[in-house]
Amino acid sequence: MRLVVCLVFLASFALVCQGEAYRGGYTGPIPRPPPIGRPPLRPVCNACYRLSVSDARNCCIKFGSCCHLVKG
């Protein structure tokens, strides 16, 4: 009996939360920020030949890789 009461409570709570989400204008997951302006990740720094000078500079400062492109 307690299990049934618990399941009914959880189902009603989920319906209320779903209704609040739509009423508040929230329709989906929060989008990720664009990659522009984000620091390059370590795997990007491993492929030095594909980097721009600014990305190579960031890789050199943060991770110590691709520094030969900056000194170039």
Swiss-Prot record:
Record keywords, A-Z: Amidation, Antibiotic, Antimicrobial, Chitin-binding, Disulfide bond, Fungicide, Signal
Residues recorded with modification Lysine amide: 71
InterPro entries in the cross-refs: Penaeidin (IPR009226)
Molecular function as annotated in GO: chitin binding
Signal peptide from the UniProt entry: 1-21
Compartment(s): Cytoplasmic granule
Keyword Disulfide bond: yes
Pfam short name (any one): Penaeidin
Source taxon at top rank: Eukaryota
Disulfide bridges in this chain: 45-59, 48-66, 60-67
Main subcellular localisation: cytoplasm
Keyword Disulfide bond: yes
Single GO cellular component term: cytoplasm
Single GO BP term: defense response to bacterium
Role: Antibacterial and antifungal activity. Presents chitin-binding activity.
Similarity comment: family membership: Belongs to the penaeidin family.
Name by which UniProt lists this protein: Penaeidin-2b
Naturally occurring in which organism (per UniProt): Penaeus vannamei (Whiteleg shrimp)
